């Protein structure tokens, strides 16, 4: 057990904890406030681990929100990106929370991405399925999105030909 001897704000707006005169860790102010600890509090390794886990989960959630504000991700894609900075467990919990909030929806992502691949790149259903699977969409969802998008194969073929041979489009 250690005794917290000092609590100070860092230049970056975090709360630095010192136990027995030595720096222990820094926390987000909200995580610190929720912990209920103060100078003179007795703290053990388990309590430090809990604080560290809570801080990491907060960081994972903040990173997830920041990433999702810039672009859409699949659940797997977001989890993969988050694990570069936080533990698998924290990344998984953050992804679950984003799904609960409706910020990640693999079916919605698949439908939108399939539409884009069809219209912009003129991909066929098989290639759309392949691209969706590569991004972490399950095979059933990928197949459903690809089949929705290729409802007129003849129009798709004409669009590809017009793009490849624009001079012949008038004939």
Which sequence ranges carry the predicted segments?
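An alpha-helical, amphipathic repeat domain used for nucleic-acid recognition
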Residues: 1-171
């Amino acid at each position: 057990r250690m005794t917290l001897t000092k609590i100070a704000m860092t230049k970056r707006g975090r709360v630095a904890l010192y136990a027995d005169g030595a720096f222990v860790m820094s926390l987000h102010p909200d995580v610190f406030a929720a912990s209920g600890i103060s100078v003179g509090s007795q703290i053990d390794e388990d309590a430090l681990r809990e604080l560290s886990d809570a801080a990491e989960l907060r960081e994972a959630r903040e990173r997830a929100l920041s990433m999702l504000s810039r672009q859409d991700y699949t659940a797997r894609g977001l989890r993969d990106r988050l694990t570069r900075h936080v533990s698998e467990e924290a990344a998984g919990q953050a992804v679950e929370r984003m799904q609960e909030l409706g910020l990640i929806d693999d079916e919605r992502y698949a439908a939108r991405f399939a539409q884009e691949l069809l219209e912009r790149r003129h991909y066929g259903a098989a290639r759309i399925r392949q691209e969706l699977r590569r991004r972490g969409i399950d095979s059933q969802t990928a197949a459903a999105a690809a089949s929705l998008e290729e409802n007129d194969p003849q129009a798709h073929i004409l669009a590809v030909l017009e793009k490849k041979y624009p001079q012949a489009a008038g004939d």
